[in-house]
Regions:
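Glycine-rich beta-strand-centered segment in the early N-terminal region that forms part
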Residues: 21-36, 45-122, 677
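Mid-domain Rossmann-like dinucleotide-binding core that forms the NAD(H)/NADP(H) cofactor-binding site
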Residues: 116, 123, 146-222
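Beta-strand-loop-alpha-helix segment that lines the small-molecule cofactor/substrate pocket
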Residues: 259-260, 469-513, 719
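Rossmann-fold NAD(P)-binding glycine/threonine-rich loop
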Residues: 268-285, 289, 295, 488-508
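Predominantly a Rossmann-like dinucleotide-binding segment in NAD(P)-dependent oxidoreductases
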Residues: 295-312, 507-508, 515-593, 706
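Contiguous beta-strand/loop segments that form the cofactor/metal-binding neighborhood of enzyme cores
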Residues: 353, 358-372, 377, 564, ...
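C-terminal helix-rich "cap/oligomerization" subdomain common to oxidoreductases
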Residues: 354-361, 368-369, 374-386, 458, ...
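N-terminal Rossmann-like dinucleotide-binding module
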Residues: 376-438
Length: 726
C-alpha cells in the first residue's frame, strides 16, 4: 500500500510502498477514503525535520541534555550512533481519516466489515491507503456524512473539547480568536450549542469565510470595539483561543475582551506569557486544552479499548467524536467550505509544499484522497530474490523497533554466515524501512509469513514482551531455531508452555541475555575459573526512572521492570556462579505514587552456597554509569564497571582492563550461529534460561510478600510447579 512518510533526518516527505498492516485484537483494518492534513501539527513536524542538527538541537534542548548525559555515561560514538538511529526511523504523518472497515481483529463487537467510519489518533489514522485503528478511536458514520467531511472528525473533536472545557451555557457570548480550521470548526460548534458567537482573525479572507458560516466576524484591529458592541459592553463569557502563533497577543486580547470572571480556553499553540494584572483584576479562569478529550494519551483507553463510565466521564474523546459526527449529520457543522485543496495520495508530498509555504498559495483545509476502486492488498514487499548460496543461518526477524535497528541488526549484519531473508512488523512501516536498510529480501506485516517461510531456518523475536512465549512456541513447532529477546515469558503459564515445547523440540533456542557474552564478562569469568569457594556477587543497576504509563510497566504487556529487564542481571550472576538460583528474597522501596516496585533489592542463593545481590534502582541519576558488578571469592576481588572497565585484585596485585563498552550482542549471536552450524548445544543451557525466568517471577512475588523471614523457594514453591500453572 502507499503511505506518506516523513524522513526525520533530511526533512523529506515521501510516499512509499509499505506492507499493508494487519489488525490485532481490538483493532480494525480500514480502507481509507480521505485524510486531513493538519496545517499546525504536521507542519511543525515537517519544519523540525527539515532543520539541520544544530537547528533541531535549538528547538529541543531537553534532548540535547539527555544526549550529553548519555555521552558521559556510554561514550561519544555510541551516543551519536543512537541519535542518528532515532532520526533514521521514518515517521508516519496524519491523525484524522475516514474510510471503510475491511477486516476486524478479535473483540471488535459492535463493528462490522463494510461499515463506514471516521478514524482518529497519531500513529493510527495516518496518511495511508489502509489504517489499523483501535475501537475507541473509530466512529461509525451515518449515511449522509461523506468521507471528506468525516476526515475532519478528529480536528472537530479538538475544537469540541476546548469548547466543553469552558462549560458553556445557552445564550452566552463566545469569542473565537483565530479562524483557521480549528477556529472555523469552533464557531460552528458554539453556534450549534445556542451561544452568540463572534470570530476574530487578522486575515480578511478568514473573516469573510466565518461570516459566510453564519456568525459575526471581525478583523483583529476592530476586535475590542466590536466586542463591546457585540456584548453590550459586558465582555465575553467565554473566549476560545484557536490561533497558531508564538505571539502573546491572543492571550492578551482574550483578557481585554472578556467579562469579569470569564473563562478562557486555549486550544491552539500560542504564547502563554499571561499578563497577571488584568487576569488578576478580572479573576479570569484560564485552561490549556489537551487534544480530543478524556482518554487521550491513556493507552488503556485508546489502545486497550477500556471505556470510562458515562456517569463519571460524560464526554470522552470517543463521545466527542460521536458528537462531532452528529453535528455533521444534522447540517450544523459544515466542512466543505473549509476545503481549499485535494491531492491524491500519490501526490501527497505536494500538500506539504503548500502547508510549509514552499508553494506560495493560500490554503485552509487540505485533503488527501485515495482510489476506492483499487483493492490490491499485500502484506509483503519484496526487495530482492532470496539467495541460493548456503548459509548456516537464514534469518527471519519479528519486530523492527529501535532495539532491532540500533542494536541487534547491526550486530547480525556484521556476521558473515547469516543471510537476512525477511522482517516483519505489525504496522508494516518499520519492517519496510529496516528491510531495505539492512538488506533483507522482503518486508511484511505478517508474523506467519516469517514463521512459515521455508527459506528461513532461524527466527529472531524482538516484539513486545507479552508476545514472546507464544511466538517462540509457534516458531519451534515450525522447525525453526529461535533467538528471543528477553524476557522469555511474562508469567508462569507462558514459561511452562515454552518448557514443554523445548522438551519435544530438536531446534535450538536462546534468549537475549547478551551480558554474559561481553568480552569483559568472559575475562571476569576466567578470573574465577578455578574457584572452589562460594561466591558473593553484587550487581548494582542504575536503571533510571520510567513513567508508570510506559508499556514496560504494565504486568500484562511488559511484565514489569523486574521480569522485563531485571532478568538480565539475574542471568549474569547465574552465568558467573554456573547454576540457577534456588531461592529469592526481594524487597522494594515504597512507591509513593511515583514508582512501580522498580527500586528493588533481590537476594539470590545458589546450590553451592553462593549469594547474589541485585540492586535494581529507578531513583538515581541517569547521567551516572548504569551498571557495576563486584565479586568476592577465594581471596580475590573483581569489579566490572559498565562493561567498560574491569579491575581484578589477587594477592595484592591489581590489574585493570579498559575498552569501549561492549555488552555482548554480537558475541551472543556469533555463539548462536556457531551452535546452529555445528549442531551443538545452545549457547545458554535451557535449565538456566528457565531458572533465571522463574527467579524473576519469584522476586516479584517476594516483593508482594515483603517478609524478611520468608524467601521464595525456587524448587518447591507452588507458583513454579506444573500443577499451579495449569
Amino acid at each position: 500500500m502507499k503511505q506518506l512518510l516523513q524522513n526525520m533526518k533530511n526533512g523529506k516527505a515521501i510516499v512509499e510502498e509499505v506492507p499493508m498492516p494487519a489488525p490485532r485484537a481490538g483493532f480494525a483494518l480500514v480502507k481509507v477514503a480521505a485524510s486531513l492534513v493538519s496545517a499546525g501539527t504536521e507542519r511543525m513536524v515537517v519544519e523540525f525535520a527539515e532543520r539541520n542538527l544544530i537547528g533541531k538541537a535549538r528547538l529541543r534542548p531537553d534532548l540535547v541534555r539527555q544526549m550529553m548525559d548519555k555521552a558521559r555515561r556510554e561514550g561519544l560514538v555510541p551516543t551519536v550512533q543512537a541519535a542518528f538511529n532515532r532520526l533514521d526511523q521514518p515517521m508516519a504523518l496524519g491523525y484524522s481519516s475516514a474510510g471503510t472497515i475491511v477486516a476486524l481483529g478479535r473483540n471488535m463487537q459492535g463493528f462490522k466489515v463494510g461499515q463506514r467510519v471516521a478514524c482518529a489518533g497519531g500513529g493510527f489514522a495516518v496518511h495511508a491507503e489502509y489504517n489499523v485503528v483501535p475501537r475507541n478511536l473509530l466512529t461509525p458514520l451515518p449515511k449522509n456524512v461523506e468521507f471528506e467531511s468525516a476526515a475532519f472528525t478528529t480536528l472537530g473533536a479538538i475544537a469540541m473539547h476546548g469548547f466543553r472545557l469552558a462549560e458553556p451555557q445557552i445564550g452566552e457570548n463566545v469569542a473565537v480568536i483565530g479562524l483557521g480550521l480549528l477556529g472555523l470548526l469552533a464557531i460552528q460548534i458554539a453556534s450549534a450549542a445556542g451561544c452568540n458567537v463572534m470570530g476574530i482573525d487578522i486575515d480578511p479572507k478568514r473573516v469573510a469565510l466565518a461570516s459566510s458560516l453564519g456568525v459575526e466576524a471581525v478583523r483583529r484591529a476592530r476586535a475590542v470595539d466590536s466586542s463591546q458592541a457585540f456584548t453590550a459592553n459586558r465582555g465575553f463569557d467565554i473566549v476560545l483561543i484557536c490561533a497558531d502563533t508564538a505571539s502573546n497577543d491572543p492571550v492578551e486580547l482574550a483578557a481585554v475582551i472578556a467579562r469579569d470572571r470569564a473563562r478562557i480556553v486555549a486550544t491552539g499553540a500560542v504564547g502563554l506569557n499571561i499578563p497577571r494584572k488584568i487576569y488578576y483584576e478580572k479573576e479570569l479562569s484560564f485552561v490549556n486544552s489537551r487534544s480530543y478529550g478524556p482518554g487521550r494519551y491513556d493507552t488503556s483507553y485508546e489502545e486497550e479499548g477500556r471505556d470510562y463510565p458515562l456517569g463519571y466521564v460524560r464526554w470522552t474523546e470517543g463521545r466527542n467524536f460521536e458528537s462531532v459526527v452528529e453535528l455533521m449529520a444534522n447540517g450544523k457543522l459544515k466542512t466543505a467550505p473549509l476545503v481549499t485543496h485535494h491531492f491524491p495520495i500519490e501526490d501527497a508530498a505536494k500538500a506539504y509544499e503548500v502547508i510549509t509555504g514552499k508553494k506560495k498559495e493560500s490554503f485552509l483545509g487540505v485533503l488527501l484522497t485515495y482510489d476506492q476502486e483499487k483493492d490490491v492488498r499485500s502484506e509483503k514487499i519484496e526487495f530482492k530474490a532470496v539467495s541460493r548460496q548456503p548459509s548456516a543461518v537464514k534469518l527471519g526477524v519479528l519486530g523492527a523497533g529501535l532495539y532491532a535497528n540500533a542494536t541487534l541488526l547491526p550486530a547480525v549484519k556484521s556476521i558473515r554466515d547469516i543471510e537476512l531473508i525477511g522482517i516483519a512488523s505489525s504496522g508494516g512501516l518499520h519492517a519496510r524501512h529496516s528491510g531495505e536498510k539492512f538488506g533483507f529480501a522482503y518486508a511484511t506485516s505478517s508474523d506467519d509469513e516469517i514463521i512459515n517461510d521455508p527459506n528461513i531456518n532461524t527466527v529472531a523475536i524482538l516484539t513486545r514482551h507479552d508476545t514472546h512465549a507464544n511466538l517462540v512456541i509457534k516458531a519451534l513447532k515450525a522447525g525453526k531455531h529461535v533467538f528471543v529477546e528477553k524476557p522469555l515469558a511474562v508469567n508462569s503459564v507462558q514459561l511452562l508452555a515454552v518448557s514443554k515445547q523445548l522438551k519435544n523440540n530438536q531446534s535450538l533456542m536462546t534468549v537475549g541475555f547478551n551480558r554474559r557474552f561481553a568480552p569483559l564478562a568472559q575475562e571476569l569469568s576466567g578470573f574465577y575459573e578455578d574457584h572452589t569457594e562460594p561466591m558473593h556477587v553484587h550487581y548494582r543497576v542504575n536503571a533510571g526512572y520510567i513513567p508508570l504509563n510506559h508499556w514496560t510497566q504494565d504486568p500484562a504487556i511488559g511484565g514489569g521492570r523486574i521480569i522485563g529487564e531485571g532478568c538480565h542481571f539475574i542471568d549474569f550472576i547465574t552465568f558467573l556462579i554456573g547454576a540457577s538460583p534456588i531461592s529469592v528474597t526481594a524487597h522494594a522501596l515504597p512507591d509513593n505514587g511515583k514508582y512501580r516496585e522498580d527500586n528493588v533489592s533481590m537476594t539470590l542463593t545458589f546450590p553451592d552456597g553462593s549469594i547474589g545481590v541485585v540492586d535494581y534502582l529507578a531513583n538515581g541519576d541517569k547521567s551516572f554509569p548504569k551498571e557495576r558488578v563486584e565479586v568476592f571469592c577465594g581471596g580475590r576481588i573483581a569489579i566490572l564497571d559498565d562493561f567498560r572497565r574491569l579491575e581484578t585484585v589477587e594477592n595484592g596485585a591489581r590489574r585493570e582492563v579498559k575498552r569501549a563498552q561492549d555488552k555482548g550482542w554480537r558475541n551472543e549471536m556469533l555463539a548462536f550461529v556457531n551452535a546452529i552450524r555445528e549442531g551443538g548445544q545452545p549457547p545458554i543451557p535451557y535449565e538456566q534460561l528457565i531458572g533465571v525466568t522463574k527467579a524473576s517471577f519469584a522476586a516479584v512475588e517476594s516483593i508482594g510478600i515483603n517478609n524478611e523471614q520468608n524467601g521464595i523457594n525456587m524448587i518447591s514453591h507452588p507458583r513454579n510447579s506444573e500443577s499451579r500453572a495449569k
